[in-house]
Amino acid sequence: MSSLWDKIQEMLEGDFIEDAFPVLVRQGVKDADVFMHSLGCSVWNTLGHELGYMAVAEGPAPVASGDNIRSDSVWFDKGNITPCVLIEFERYDGSERGKAKLITKLTNLMEASQRWDHQPVLLVLSTWSSGLVSAPDFAALEELFRKGVSNSKGSRIPKPTGCSLLLHRMFFRPDFDGILRLKHMKFRWS
């Protein structure tokens, strides 16, 4: 597992984003509509392909009694089509609503893992922020991951077995013209 961790972090901290998505680093992106979300999902999907997976955007988890769950990116093993990595990419603005949204996304990842019979080995909750905002409470999110959560229907979702969690944050700084450029990333592995 640690080799997958190492590869993900090494590529994201290396030249991968600048080479594949130069607009995030050089030209910059206007904070409008959902373009940043599309770019972030594309970063994760492309990274999955680069690491040898069949990466699928908006990958639906098998249907169960709860709501439909579509992870922003699902990385499948090409040989046996097993889901190995589930990813959600979300804006974080530091508000109470933003904090609640991260809990919902983590819950969705955990429930999707359960629906996939706990086959994924890694869940990724990747966030992005524009400018200075309070940090997401990664310790609280890790605690939910370890103890389990309840979904919107009240069903208990236990900690995924044999699975790790990456809490990832992308920091974008707006320039004088309001254009956002990626300045830094933080990785927290559990």
Task: Go through each PLM region and give its residues.
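Acidic-basic catalytic patches of nuclease active cores, encompassing PD-(D/E)XK
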Residues: M1-P62
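Short, well-structured alpha-helical interface segments that form or flank functional binding sites
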Residues: F35, L39-V43, G66-N68, R97-N108
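Acidic/glycine-enriched edge-of-secondary-structure segments
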Residues: M54-N68, I81-K101
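Active-site beta-strand-loop-beta-strand hairpin of nuclease catalytic cores
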Residues: V74-L86, W116
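Catalytic cores of nucleic-acid endonucleases
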Residues: Y92-V149
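Domain-level recognition of nuclease-like catalytic cores that cleave nucleotide substrates
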Residues: V124-S190
